[in-house]
């Protein structure tokens, strides 16, 4: 057990040391709120930072539980964020992302009960993200995104979110 722990620690250290400069790789976590439908969304992302932009991938999960509809949606996709402003403590990024995923929904009413529906969903997101650096490796951000999700119960959404970025 001790050997496994030492080996795991060594592998983590090697992964961090492989970064060419501080901030070359990142992991972020976001808790979002879809304003149009009062829906919560969780996002986990990772990627690489370049001089003027970030390239990464996101995994999203959202749960909609309303009187007439109950739906769960999981999406993944690439993300490109461009630094519109980049300072020592504050950055402003423009975001473009693609999404592809799966939605499972159940629609119901007092008169009609419909079976579960499953759908392949795809779409895009555009947005803006101000980011504040707390230390060389940790940043907090707020975010606004407009999302168009085809084949979904909810096609277009306005999202706001708060999150944290850890630079490796």
Model-derived features with residue positions:
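Solvent-exposed loop/turn segments connecting transmembrane beta-strands
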Residues: 29-43, 65-71, 88, 148-157
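Outer-membrane beta-barrel "beta-signal"
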Residues: 156-168
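Transmembrane beta-barrel strands of outer-membrane/channel proteins
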Residues: 29-33, 44-48, 57-61, 78, ...
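Structural signature of outer-membrane beta-barrel channels/translocons
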Residues: 47-51, 81-85, 129-133, 165-167
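Flexible, solvent-exposed loop segments that connect beta-strands
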Residues: 24, 55-74, 100-122, 153, ...
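Short glycine/proline- and aromatic-enriched beta-strand/turn motifs that initiate or cap beta-hairpins
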Residues: 18-64, 165-167
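Repeated loop/turn-to-beta-strand initiation elements of outer-membrane beta-barrel proteins
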Residues: 51-57, 88-90, 132-140
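Cleavable N-terminal export/targeting peptides
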Residues: 1-24
